[in-house]
Regions:
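Local sequence-structure signature of Cys/Sec-based thiol-disulfide redox active-site neighborhoods
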Residues: 1-34
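Hydrophobic beta-strand residues in large extracellular and virion-surface proteins
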Residues: 7-9, 28, 39, 50-52, ...
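Aromatic-residue detector
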Residues: 13-15, 29, 46, 64, ...
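Compositionally biased, charge-rich low-complexity tracts
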Residues: 23-25, 29-30, 34, 86-88, ...
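A generic structural motif
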Residues: 33-41
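Short, intrinsically disordered low-complexity segments
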Residues: 41-62
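Non-catalytic, surface beta->alpha helical segment in thiol-disulfide oxidoreductase systems
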Residues: 55-100
Length: 103
């Protein structure tokens, strides 16, 4: 199977973010499974909120979700990330993401 890149999640080392990470993580897993993409999670002390990026090959990471000030459900997070990936799939450098357009 051809790799469709990966999602990179940055989260705080604060234990208070674990519940949010689970919610966001489940949403990312749903999108990643549709694309055949990998997921990496990094805990950092210099991160105040949870951030999700998409990375395909090179070093460039595209921000697809920021949880700052949000308490959205898994479904809301999923639709937000999916919407960003859908839009990105029209860019010539990200045609591998076109599978997100199929239902």
């Amino acid at each position: 199977m051809l790799s469709s890149g990966k999602f990179v999640i940055y989260t705080s080392r604060s234990s208070g973010r674990r519940k949010r990470l689970k919610t966001i993580g489940r949403a990312v897993v749903r999108v990643a499974e549709r694309l055949g993409a990998d997921i990496e999670v990094y805990q950092r002390k210099d991160v105040l909120s949870i951030f999700v990026y998409y990375k395909n090959g090179g070093e460039e990471k595209i921000p697809v979700y920021c949880d700052w000030g949000k308490n959205w459900s898994e479904e809301d997070v999923y639709h937000t990330i999916r919407s960003v990936i859908y839009t990105l799939s029209f860019h010539p450098d990200y045609t591998i993401l076109q599978t997100i357009r199929k239902r």
